[in-house]
From Swiss-Prot:
This is Phosphoribosylformylglycinamidine cyclo-ligase. It comes from Streptococcus gordonii (strain Challis / ATCC 35105 / BCRC 15272 / CH1 / DL1 / V288). Belongs to the AIR synthase family. GO terms for molecular function: ATP binding; phosphoribosylamine-glycine ligase activity; phosphoribosylformylglycinamidine cyclo-ligase activity. InterPro entries: PurM-like_C_dom, PurM-like_C_sf, PurM-like_N, PurM-like_N_sf, PurM_cligase. It is an enzyme of class 6 (ligase).
Length: 340
């Protein structure tokens, strides 16, 4: 083993790493926004906070991945939307606290650096950043032979946003009588996929199940997570929202109570929840108890807002999309979430 080839013979292709950087530059350029300083490739990404115009800035950060949805992206060899999932999981969390996303960083670890595939992944990250209004200011691609199989990779992201101190959403303003408004999800989003994969383990993905309205199973399973930033930011700026819950792992039961105090509860009318076909299919083919579905999945509502009754009309006007009045905030007696 010569010194020149030593690293390559251990499974790390440095030249492929350089190629990835060149391939992703055009995608990163799409995410440029006011405040970005420096260029791709520095030791640290820089952002000038003064460019936001926020008077009393509070930085709010979030980090997440996409779980085993990645395994389906690998199985179906479709890698161009999984990056959007990663961005969505992070920015939807920080928008729930009232933050406007400013910038994003990604981390990809793989067993074998395949530049064309990794370009697709980062292109998806960039698309997510564009939808969120966040700049992609840095990242890391780690080739780790022996840690991962050659076809395997993992993806994580980190979002940083800013909120006006007076506009932080921390649940303290949520009150009895507030109306719960649901914003539609695009599908399963990015949680519950260990169960999803078990339910559909014997399917190729090419199937068109009767519940899925003409779509192939793999298309529905890989539908990218909706990013709610541009829909919800105007509501935050006008201080129309008292609480926001991002419905991810743990479904309604775990996530809705995170947006209000311990002495309150959410009373939800199940008949008003816009349940998507994929959830009906999962319940049927997976033989999952109906009540458990609400403990795992978003069931068609990816983001839930708590809004004072007098502000509901203005919120609907600004959203300009179907908005579902699915319940109210009540005084807590026993459970934090009551589904009727």
């Amino acid at each position: 083993m010569t010194n020149k080839n030593a690293y390559a013979q251990s499974g790390v292709d440095v030249e492929a790493g350089y190629e990835v950087v060149e391939r992703i530059k055009k995608h990163v350029a799409r995410t440029e926004r006011a405040g970005v300083m420096g260029a791709l490739g520095g030791f640290g990404g820089m952002f000038d906070l003064s460019k936001t115009g926020v008077k009393e800035p509070v930085l709010i950060s979030g980090t997440d991945g996409v779980g085993t949805k990645l395994m389906l992206a690998i199985k179906y060899d479709k890698h161009d939307t999984i990056g959007q999932d990663c961005v969505a999981m992070c920015v939807n969390d920080i928008i729930a606290a009232g933050a406007e996303p400013l910038y994003f960083l990604d981390y990809v670890a793989t067993g074998k650096n395949e530049p064309a595939k990794l370009e697709q992944v980062v292109a998806g990250v960039a698309e997510g950043c564009v939808q969120a209004g966040a700049a992609l200011i840095g990242g890391e691609t780690a080739e780790m032979p022996g840690m991962y199989g050659e076809d395997d990779y993992d993806l994580a992201g980190f979002a940083v946003g800013v909120a006006e101190k007076s506009q932080i959403i921390d649940g303290s303003k949520v009150a009895e009588g507030d109306v719960l408004l649901g914003l539609a999800s695009s599908g399963i989003h990015s949680n519950g996929y260990s169960l999803v994969r078990r339910v559909f383990a014997d399917y190729t993905g090419e199937e068109v199940l009767p519940e899925l309205e003409g779509k192939k199973l793999k298309e529905v399973l890989l539908e990218p997570t909706r990013i709610y930033v541009k829909a919800v930011l105007p509501l935050i700026k006008e201080e129309l929202v008292n609480g926001i819950a991002h419905i991810t792992g743990g479904g309604f039961i775990e996530n809705v109570p995170r947006m209000f105090a311990d002495d309150l509860a959410a009373e939800i009318e199940e008949s008003k929840v816009p349940v998507l076909p994929i959830f009906k299919a999962l319940e049927k083919y997976g033989e999952i108890k109906h009540e458990e579905m609400f403990e795992i999945f978003n069931m068609g509502v990816g983001l839930m807002l708590a809004v004072s009754p007098e502000n509901v009309g203005r919120v609907k006007e600004l959203l300009d999309e179907p908005v579902y009045e699915i319940g109210r905030i009540v005084k807590k007696e026993n459970e934090s979430v009551i589904i009727k």
